[in-house]
């Protein structure tokens, strides 16, 4: 160090000697006589920016990109990393000279050498130099002399010697009827194949069923006759008979045309608003979820093209010829797939029922009518179809509908075709898909359409590879591929060949081939339907079997990728992450990624698929360990002859709904996503309870996927919760000092049940990370430590006051306790003992208007504008009751004590009594209202006495304050009547010899039941859960009536003089 004298003291200064004249990568080596010279380890900035620290204190360091000046190089470096990362990559990038051989390059060159040697090529070094252009002949020669390289050569040759020769698998034509007859006559001399054995087992199962006892409309005897004659008449005749039978039990239904009267043109804005409200309410009654999503997504501007445009376009896409054969090796499975084509059981039928909300197929069979079929009849139908290996003609046809991909869809390619086959076909294919899915040893890199959280698996793998590369300064090249119309263009021949390669039973392969070659479809749009045609390619989106068939073809692709190419994560190599047709490739070198792209393109072209080069992109991360950094470089990669775009460090891209950059997951801000939708929900013609329902069940859950797998800060989550609470208060007209816990506590505990993203997001992330399954990275220490670190970070975020909120019940309990500790929420403490009483809060029923719901919520949380409430924190103001009572004007005083609301209190009490009385009479009880019982202790008048089967039940109703335990009040009421003199009087008066029981219907003025009271009434059969819910609403309404009566008479006061 050198020292210079300044007025403030001595400032140390480091002397730097710069090597080179520019900031380029062509730097000369440091000569031996300059070994003592010190120079920076990383040449990041131009030469003129290197100045002594003492001089830097006097002169500022400018940024060459934006011109901003800084006091030090460190400040400039921070600025470059945060504001100009792409320009910083350009400055940091170095040209490799005599770069080290990576393990991936060694494997690729060894495999290429084996290939060249097998082809009889000479001058191997020069030939290899042609393929490895970035390596010199001398470098290749030296590598070939190494022992580890020679071991790789021997290993590859050993694998080639063990690999069997595989012939191309082609689709043979189906045998003619005469050939089939000849095969039948010669079957006695040939051994029984597994296919014939399975058919015999299915037919034996059909004949072994016991007779079905059912209604005559199901024609059980006719179906049994078809089964008995099946082996004599053959499969074609059996199919025809089965088709006629299905038409008999499921009569063909015509197309339903609903006549909708066009709305009258509104005369003014009020009438226009009423019409909009009526339309939204009708849609709400039909399907709440669809109505909410249409309101949240804004105006749907999608317009389906006319039939003249849609039909030619999609018919050409679906009927284009596809490759007739697909070559590949036979995939070895751990166990046989013969179970796929075996007799269907009753358990299979129960597990594969079609949802009642699903649409019917062209045959008109609805899911409800299919469920009405006796299980014995349905078992026979399904197994007959299995035995025949084809579908009956009456259920072969499917209809294809189109759903828009975006709200601005206008072109034919902007719509997604969805096939809607018969409900019976969907149930049968669901059974076969479940069996096939559980029998295949799937490649661990394929996570789509499998019973696992595939999105979490693959999104976390991409994040792991990116972050691991930057942390350890390793090179990594990534390609995100977009398959154009993957489900609509897949070759049928590739499906059949893949099923054979995986060892699927012949009967199953024939069934798939028959359904695809013999099953037609018709295109349906807005009021039009095309003629039936048979698609020549593509899988049927909407059919349960289609995802599994597509997965099989993609699984075959993954098995063809070279295992030695890929990104190295610890001691494992991963080269692909697939979710159905979303494919991401990883490689350690540029050449390795190009090899993976070529392999993928070759396979996809064979199976009839194409890559959309414009939508594909690559990310090239170059590791520079000596400089302890990574840089993004724009390398050229090709799909065929088309170049793929290369992304920079700041470019964002989306994979499985999660935003990424080259450094990993991108910080997301959920407030930006939910803010506009909250505004749309505010303007929508909905009731307040409907807005809360939409917020709780649709809008907030839409954020869960991005919050669980993306990156989000705790502060951002708190701000989003604050934004949500602002709109909730606005919708319900709540004051600002309403407890926050009231918004987030669950309805069963007295709150509104709005999820708090601050706690829900880390909990969901921890749960999804805990469910991640990486079979190919199970023993990888790097992957395991990465997962554990991420889970621990989520756990740390869930620590609240020394308690870990690791589950949803724990979060709900946390908010409920905070609510009960507040002044306004203490009266809801006993609300958690019985859940159905809160149904009106969480479910948008027609019991309450929007105004009544808002007032009920304010009553529930003690937010009505009484004097005590409005003068809170200002004790100098008057708080006495405006009616002249010698008590503070509180909500409890108005509801329970004030003389002005006495009449409403009586009406509230009588309303509860009448509801219980009506329910008892519906159960066959004889009910006496307020009988006068003259006893030794005086006159007693219980509200209800119910007589049933010589048994007496005495019920008395009370609505109490919320300042005391309601269970204690319930017990006091029972003790009030459960006395010997009252029992004696009841037996004398009603001449009952049975038991006498005493009950109370105890609630507080908020509409909260005593847990012991309501549970005892329900257990004794004196009250239903529905009635308890209605009574809770009636008490709340009665309390509101008390308050309204008090406020209406607030101009008058009692003269106490």
Swiss-Prot record:
A zinc finger (C2H2-type) spans 61-84. Residues 384-660 form the Reverse transcriptase domain. It comes from the Eukaryota. Residues 173-195 are annotated as: Disordered. The keyword Metal-binding applies. One of its GO terms (molecular function) is RNA-directed DNA polymerase activity. Residues 183-195 have a biased composition (Polar residues). One of its GO terms (biological process) is proteolysis. Keywords: Aspartyl protease, Endonuclease, Hydrolase, Metal-binding, Nuclease, Nucleotidyltransferase, Protease, RNA-directed DNA polymerase, Transferase, Transposable element, Zinc, Zinc-finger. CDD domains: RT_nLTR_like. It catalyses: DNA(n) + a 2'-deoxyribonucleoside 5'-triphosphate = DNA(n+1) + diphosphate. Its EC number is 3.4.23.-, 2.7.7.49. InterPro entries: DNA/RNA_pol_sf (IPR043502), Rev_trsase/Diguanyl_cyclase (IPR043128), RT_dom (IPR000477), Znf_C2H2_type (IPR013087). This is Retrovirus-related Pol polyprotein from type-2 retrotransposable element R2DM. It comes from Drosophila melanogaster.
């Amino acid at each position: 160090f050198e020292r210079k004298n300044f007025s403030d003291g001595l400032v140390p200064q480091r002397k730097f000697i710069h090597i080179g004249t520019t900031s380029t990568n062509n730097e000369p080596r440091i000569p031996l006589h300059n070994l003592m010279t010190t120079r920076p380890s990383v040449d990041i900035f131009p030469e003129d920016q290197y100045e002594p620290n003492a001089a830097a204190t006097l002169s500022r360091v400018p940024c060459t990109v934006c011109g901003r000046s800084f006091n030090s190089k460190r400040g400039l470096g921070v600025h470059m990393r945060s504001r100009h990362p792409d320009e910083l990559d350009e400055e940091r990038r170095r040209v490799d000279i005599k770069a080290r051989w990576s393990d991936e390059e060694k494997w690729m060159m060894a495999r290429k050498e084996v290939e060249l040697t097998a082809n009889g090529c000479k001058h191997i070094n020069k030939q290899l130099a042609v393929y490895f252009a970035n390596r010199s002949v001398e470098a290749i020669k030296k590598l070939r002399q190494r022992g580890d390289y020679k071991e790789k050569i021997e290993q590859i040759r050993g694998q080639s010697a063990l690999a069997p020769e595989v012939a191309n698998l082609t689709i043979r034509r189906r045998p003619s009827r005469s050939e089939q007859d000849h095969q039948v006559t010669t079957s006695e001399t040939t051994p029984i194949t597994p296919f014939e054995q399975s058919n015999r087992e299915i037919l034996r199962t059909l004949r072994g069923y016991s007779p079905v006892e059912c209604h005559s409309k199901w024609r059980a005897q006719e179906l049994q006759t078809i089964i008995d004659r099946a082996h004599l008449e053959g499969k074609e005749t059996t199919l025809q008979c089965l088709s006629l039978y299905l038409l008999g039990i499921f009569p063909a239904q015509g197309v339903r045309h609903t006549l909708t009267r066009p709305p009258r043109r509104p005369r003014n804005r009020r009438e226009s608003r009423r019409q909009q409200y009526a339309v939204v309410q009708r849609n709400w009654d039909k399907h709440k979820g669809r109505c909410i999503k249409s309101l949240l997504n804004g105006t749907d501007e999608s317009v389906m093209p006319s039939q003249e445009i849609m039909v030619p376009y999609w018919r050409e896409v679906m009927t284009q010829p596809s490759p007739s054969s697909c070559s590949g090796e036979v995939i070895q499975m751990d166990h046989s797939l013969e179970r796929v084509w075996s007799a269907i059981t009753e358990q299979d039928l129960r597990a594969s029922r079609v949802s009642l909300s699903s649409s019917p197929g062209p045959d008109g069979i609805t899911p409800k009518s299919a469920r009405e079929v006796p299980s014995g009849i349905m078992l026979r139908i399904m197994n007959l179809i299995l035995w025949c290996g084809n579908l009956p003609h009456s259920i072969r046809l499917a209809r294809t509908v189109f759903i828009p991909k975006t709200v601005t869809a206008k072109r034919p390619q902007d719509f997604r075709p969805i096939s809607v086959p018969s409900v019976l076909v969907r149930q049968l294919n669901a059974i076969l898909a479940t069996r096939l899915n559980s029998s295949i040893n799937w490649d661990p890199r394929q996570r789509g359409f499998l019973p696992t959280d595939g999105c979490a698996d693959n999104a976390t793998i991409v994040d792991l590879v990116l972050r691991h590369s930057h942390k350890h300064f390793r090179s990594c090249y990534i390609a995100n591929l977009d398959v154009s119309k993957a489900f609509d263009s897949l070759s049928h021949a590739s499906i059949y060949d893949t099923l054979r390669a995986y060892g699927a039973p012949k009967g199953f392969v024939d069934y798939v081939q028959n359904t695809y070659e013999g099953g037609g479809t018709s295109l349906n749009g807005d009021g039009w339907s095309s003629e039936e045609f048979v698609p020549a390619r593509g899988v049927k989106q909407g059919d349960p079997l289609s995802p599994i068939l597509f997965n099989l073809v993609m699984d075959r692709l993954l098995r063809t990728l070279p295992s030695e190419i890929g990104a190295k994560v610890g001691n494992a190599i991963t080269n692909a992450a697939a979710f159905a047709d979303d494919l991401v490739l990883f490689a350690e070198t540029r050449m390795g990624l190009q090899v993976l792209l070529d392999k993928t393109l070759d396979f996809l072209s064979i199976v009839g698929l194409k890559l959309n080069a414009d939508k594909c992109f690559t990310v090239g991360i170059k590791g520079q360990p000596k400089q302890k950094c990574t840089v993004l470089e724009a390398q050229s990669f090709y799909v065929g002859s088309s170049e793929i775009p290369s992304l920079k460090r700041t470019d964002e891209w989306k994979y499985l709904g999660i935003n990424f950059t080259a450094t990993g997951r991108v910080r997301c801000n959920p407030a930006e996503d939910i803010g506009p939708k909250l505004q749309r929900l505010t303007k929508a013609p909905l009731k307040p309870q409907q807005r809360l329902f939409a917020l709780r069940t649709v809008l907030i859950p839409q954020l869960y996927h991005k919050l669980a797998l993306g990156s989000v800060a705790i502060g951002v989550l708190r701000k989003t919760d604050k934004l949500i609470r602002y709109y909730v208060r606005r919708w319900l007209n709540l004051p600002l000092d309403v407890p926050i816990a009231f918004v987030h506590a669950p309805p069963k505990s007295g709150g509104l049940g709005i999820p708090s993203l601050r706690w829900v997001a880390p909990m969901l992330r921890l749960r999804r990370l805990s469910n991640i399954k990486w079979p190919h990275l199970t023993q990888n220490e790097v992957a395991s430590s990465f997962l554990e670190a991420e889970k621990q970070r989520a756990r740390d975020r869930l620590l609240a006051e020394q308690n870990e909120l690791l589950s949803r019940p724990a979060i709900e309990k946390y908010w409920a306790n905070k609510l009960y500790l507040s002044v306004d929420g203490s009266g809801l403490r006993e609300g958690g003992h019985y859940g159905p009483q809160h149904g009106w809060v969480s479910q948008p029923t027609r019991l309450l208007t929007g105004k009544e719901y808002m007032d009920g919520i304010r009553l529930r949380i003690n937010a009505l504008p009484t004097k005590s409430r409005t003068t809170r924190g200002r004790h100098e103001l008057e708080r006495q009751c405006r009616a002249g009572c010698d008590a503070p004007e509180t909500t409890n005083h108005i509801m329970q004590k004030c003389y002005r609301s006495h009449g409403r209190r009586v009406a509230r009490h009588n309303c509860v009594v009448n509801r219980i009385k009506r329910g008892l009479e519906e159960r066959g009880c004889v009910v006496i209202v307020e009988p006068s019982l003259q006893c030794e202790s005086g006159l007693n008048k219980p509200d209800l006495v119910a007589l049933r089967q010589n048994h007496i039940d005495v019920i008395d109703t009370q609505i109490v304050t919320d300042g005391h335990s309601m269970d204690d009040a319930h017990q006091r009421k029972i003790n009030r009547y459960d006395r010997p003199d009252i029992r004696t009087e009841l037996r004398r008066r009603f001449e009952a010899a049975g038991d006498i029981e005493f009950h109370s219907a105890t609630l507080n003025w908020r509409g909260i039941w005593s847990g012991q009271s309501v549970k005892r009434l329900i257990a004794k059969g004196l009250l239903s859960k529905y009635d308890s819910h209605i009574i809770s609403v009636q008490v709340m309404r009665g309390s509101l009536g008390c308050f309204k009566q008090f406020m209406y008479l607030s101009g008058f006061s009692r003269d106490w003089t």
